[in-house]
Amino acid sequence: MQDVQRTVEVSVGPIVGLDYTLLYDTLPETVSDNITLPDLKDPERVTEDTKKLILKGCVYIAYHHPLETDTLFIKVHKHITEFCHSFLSHLLGGEDDDNALIDIGLFFNMLQPSLGGWITKNFLRHPNRMSKDQIKLLLDQIIKMAKAESSDTEEYEKVWKKMPTYFESIIQPLLHKT
């Protein structure tokens, strides 16, 4: 019997149903002018800064979403959450913990220097209560703060390891707000 070895490998492409060419064409020029189409499918090709640029482009796409019945929504927008989850996992080092909730208290404290003027623990627990602009600000701040770091820190274990799933839960309501 062959041993199965567990590896920490995050696959971004292909996400079934996602039209990568349309995704590329939908990204703002500040993003698409600095990446190639294969960069969207293979994060190994790009630097940490480029990964952040792509994630910011995805937040832009989610913020400026079309109607849910639009072909663009069906081929790109409804897949943005899964794409962001995978891409952020890769940015943070590939280790992803979907089984536990983020430590809201610790995350709240981490956000104080940048978003302390308005962010509340209640908003962090219930992102659908935030306005479209507040969700975008929070997502942009997460991207700005995200980095691959040592996995033996409390911050990594309680916040960043769980962040891809949390990020997905924040970007989802953005796709449905008008």
From Swiss-Prot:
Protein name listed in UniProt: Major non-capsid protein
Pfam families documented for this protein: Tenui_NCP (PF04876)
Species in which this protein is naturally found: Rice stripe virus (isolate M)
Subcellular location(s) of the protein: Host cytoplasm
Family designation: Belongs to the tenuiviruses NCP family.
GO annotation, cellular component aspect: host cell cytoplasm
Span of the signal peptide: none
Chain's role: Induces the formation of large intracellular inclusion body, organized in amorphous and crystalline arrays. Presumably the main cause of the stripe disease observed in host.
